[in-house]
Amino acid sequence: MSSYIVHRQNITRKEQSTIYWVNVLLSMLTGLLLVAIAWPISWFYHLPQLGGLIMLTSLNFLVLGSLSQYQAHFIKAKRMILLAKIEMVTKFLAFAFTVILLYYSPLGVSAVILGLFANAALRIGCMIWFGDKSWRPTFEFDQGTFYSSLKYGIYQLGSQTINQLRTQADSLIVGKVMGAELLGVYSLAKELILQPLKLVTPVINRLALPRFAEKQHDPVRLQQLFLKGTFVIMLFSAIMYLAIGILSPVIVRVLYGPAHEAVGQLIPLMLLFGMLRPMGGLTGAISQANGRTNVEFYWNVVASIIVVLVLASVWIWPQVEYVALTLSISQVLISVFAHPFFIKPVIGIRFLPYARQWISVSAVFVGIIALVSHYNLFIMPEWFSRWL
């Protein structure tokens, strides 16, 4: 719901306060829900200590609702550099706090959870201190804003939930069809592909969301921004994943050790998936900026159907290499079908201008990776045997 503030460019103090208190209330209700289910979960898993840890985790929700609102204000005001500085400093302080607790107290896992809470509390404290006073909420409520922001937030939450389930569908099938051993190999390869996305996607959203929101009433300029953004992101993503692909034998040896070199055989098959996936951050940002989270939700349903249909073929070819390849196949299909189901309804761009931004880059990327794989042009760990 925090991105609703960015979408609503001109918002009154009363409307802003309404969104703030609704977000805080929902955050606290989520925390109470965690407290309520803590003991049933610990009983189900026969781990008595788990209940206390889950209840301790609920502390985070005391500040997360407020934190997300202030973060949205920083993004809307394009104060990303200050926001990044706050996050780096508070993460370092929270890390130091966690290490001290682990070293000088018997808290164990609880120290890590308290470290997360300390990080959130420090961040909101710094954001309040460095943020504008006009961002601070008042005790006012606007019913119209409440309903519109709630509708916006529910669709966005639904989209994120479906997206997470879709991301894990392949792992469920590998575990069911091929067993735990191959699931372990597959999961390590996929995690290596996903890790850069966890860093890149939030940056894309933070940079794109306020700019798209500013131009939401200027369709021509919005289309130009989207097309330019797509091309730049694809170019950056292609270079990043090309480097990961060529260095994959070394990366696997360093991260997983020589016993898991089978992981490296799956990575080239997943590279196109990783390269194309950052486009999802851009499409998500443009739907949120235009207040079209309902279209984003329905598109995620369609994308999930595409993934399930492609994954269904795994029962015909139950090979872990084929499952790795289906990730890339699914992402290509999602990139194509995103146009009629999502991009055209939201910003009205024709297919050819959209396709030109990523198909040519993807074709060159696939060609280079194919040549590297065919002629075994990977950088090998044996070249660095003195250090590895």
Curated annotation (Swiss-Prot):
* Keywords annotated in UniProt: Cell membrane, Exopolysaccharide synthesis, Membrane, Transmembrane, Transmembrane helix, Virulence
Location(s), subcellular = Cell membrane
* Domain of life assignment: Bacteria
Query: One matching Pfam family, short form?
Result: Polysacc_synt_3
Topology relative to the membrane: Multi-pass membrane protein
Q: Which GO terms describe its cellular component?
A: plasma membrane
Parts of the chain that traverse the membrane: 24-44, 47-67, 97-117, 231-251, 297-317, 359-379
A GO biological-process term: polysaccharide biosynthetic process
Keyword RNA-binding on this protein? no
Pathway participation: Glycan metabolism; exopolysaccharide biosynthesis
Xref: InterPro entries: Poly_Biosynth_Transport (IPR050833)
User: What biological function has been recorded for the protein in this entry?
Assistant: Involved in the biosynthesis of amylovoran which functions as a virulence factor.
Question: What family is reported?
Answer: Belongs to the polysaccharide synthase family.
Protein name in the entry = Amylovoran biosynthesis protein AmsL
Question: Which species expresses this protein natively?
Answer: Erwinia amylovora
Q: What is the lineage of its organism?
A: Bacteria, Pseudomonadati, Pseudomonadota, Gammaproteobacteria, Enterobacterales
User: What gene does the UniProt entry assign to this protein?
Assistant: amsL
